[in-house]
């Protein structure tokens, strides 16, 4: 299986202004995730059986693979959605490996002109997979080129301009489009309706992350205790990408400090040093919560107001930080805006434990 990546896009990583470090707990891919490509390729599961977690998704895709192989057809077009870092790209590579085909990887922001996506489509061999990350960000022209490609296996190209313009149809080899998005509701209905499979990836449970940490540590030849793996899993925000990133940083710490293995104490001390607390919250998470409490009385407050007060981009707050804060019950979303929960106040040490239940019922 060949993996081809279409470059030319990406945003600079969010940095912790207090510590001057890349935020270890962001679920977005950081440069270090790309630079450590050799280790990343070793850690990344290659087959569906090696993929840990997402049990229901694996069963659905296993059936799709078996059926497509039996009919000697490409997989149906599919849409994978959910928070970043949960394995959407990895799953597309696994599907390509299981089907014995190539996988071309790109992202919607890189497909600015019609020829960008036309070149990718024409270059696909029979059965190949085209993976488009952030597919909700496709521009209108690129999206409209996909419609006949997905439905009828053809590429409609306009030649000329004005009254002399004409459309030429180019036949395409059968292929599978896999779209990935964190915002499935942002897709247009015509595009969304053309996917035969639409599947959601959920946050991982702690026991699933423990298994992932143990597997990665074994591949990296890094001794780790069960308690050390548990400590990493608890602080990984339900996200494998973050779990593996934390493992690499703790491995650095253990090596420099002369520890042979990663114990609970080593993991906790290292993560405290990197400003990742017991629930995986980092400097920016706490900034968001404390700003809402100090400036807006805990809410309700709108997203743009939070962004202005914290100096963070509103999309970054909504797509990177907010999903986990909602998942663990630290934020509530209401028609009037976001509200900091009593559980979050308790975690920040702002109210006694016995008051937390009562405050959750306040308007």
Curated annotation (Swiss-Prot):
Signal peptide (residue range): none
Class of the enzyme per the UniProt entry, highest EC level: hydrolase
CDD domains assigned: AAA
Large ATPase domain (RuvB-L): region residues: 13-204
Molecular function terms, GO-annotated: ATP binding; ATP hydrolysis activity; four-way junction DNA binding; four-way junction helicase activity
Residues at which ATP binds: 43-44, 85, 88-90, 194, 204, 241
Region described as Head domain (RuvB-H): spans on this chain: 278-363
Region of interest: Disordered: 1-44
InterPro entries: AAA+_ATPase, AAA_lid_4, DNA_helicase_Holl-junc_RuvB, P-loop_NTPase, RuvB-like_N, RuvB_C, WH-like_DNA-bd_sf, WH_DNA-bd_sf
Catalytic activity: ATP + H2O = ADP + phosphate + H(+)
Family designation: Belongs to the RuvB family.
Function: The RuvA-RuvB-RuvC complex processes Holliday junction (HJ) DNA during genetic recombination and DNA repair, while the RuvA-RuvB complex plays an important role in the rescue of blocked DNA replication forks via replication fork reversal (RFR). RuvA specifically binds to HJ cruciform DNA, conferring on it an open structure. The RuvB hexamer acts as an ATP-dependent pump, pulling dsDNA into and through the RuvAB complex. RuvB forms 2 homohexamers on either side of HJ DNA bound by 1 or 2 RuvA tetramers; 4 subunits per hexamer contact DNA at a time.
Subunit field text: Homohexamer. Forms an RuvA(8)-RuvB(12)-Holliday junction (HJ) complex. HJ DNA is sandwiched between 2 RuvA tetramers; dsDNA enters through RuvA and exits via RuvB. An RuvB hexamer assembles on each DNA strand where it exits the tetramer. Each RuvB hexamer is contacted by two RuvA subunits (via domain III) on 2 adjacent RuvB subunits; this complex drives branch migration. In the full resolvosome a probable DNA-RuvA(4)-RuvB(12)-RuvC(2) complex forms which resolves the HJ.
UniProt-recorded name of the protein: Holliday junction branch migration complex subunit RuvB
Biological source species: Picosynechococcus sp. (strain ATCC 27264 / PCC 7002 / PR-6)
Name of the encoding gene: ruvB
